[in-house]
């Protein structure tokens, strides 16, 4: 484990990236020109064909996804779900968290959800990132309690398995402010189950694609509860077009 751009004390067995650079031969790490539309990652995705293809994600798209996730105001962008007028000021949907931000990524980091939609925003926020070696709901509940996880974003089956696990009733999950994710539709019944199970937290969902560097639409809290089958409105930097079977 390497610490980057921090003066804080690091855990035993970890080091600092600056120390690694200091030991390197300057000629080994040449200066590289990087453009905003250069590739930053290649994620292999099966899409709808079932055969993995390497999707090339750019710096511009990945940074835009971070800002979409961090700056999107659901109270404004999801207003029509409850018929709220533009000038209305909705009441807060959740109480401020008493815990520092801690994101759990139960899906692999080679997937756009975990990397671009969890790791990147968590890094920008300076939040804790909690990883799992493999998915096991009992172990995940243990980590949620121990690490005081505030946001869990996985596939819907993961949320359902957590709520159905016998340890849900005995583990302290009061730190959870948000629970949901993407990768598949968040079923309406699960939306209401999450809303009823969390102690002050809210369900969340979204739709995205690897090729768009992350999310396309997002929905959460009272607006998702009001329209649990909705994936939400578009994020600020994307456009959508509806096309019927005749291409219209």
Residue map of PLM features:
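ANL superfamily adenylate-forming
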Residues: 1-36, 63
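Conserved AMP-binding A3 loop
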Residues: 40-80
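Conserved pre-ATP/AMP-binding loop-to-beta segment of ANL
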Residues: 25-44, 51, 94-102
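Short Gly/Pro-enriched turn/cap motifs at secondary-structure boundaries
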Residues: 33, 229-234
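Gly/Ser/Thr-rich phosphate-binding loop
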Residues: 124-127, 146-154, 163-226, 239, ...
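Beta-strand->loop->alpha-helix junctions that form or flank phosphate-binding loops
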Residues: 1-8, 203-211, 232-234
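Short beta-strand->loop structural element characteristic of the AMP-binding/adenylate-forming
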Residues: 2, 53-56, 128-134, 204
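Conserved AMP-binding/adenylation subdomain of ANL enzymes
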Residues: 63-106, 110-150, 165
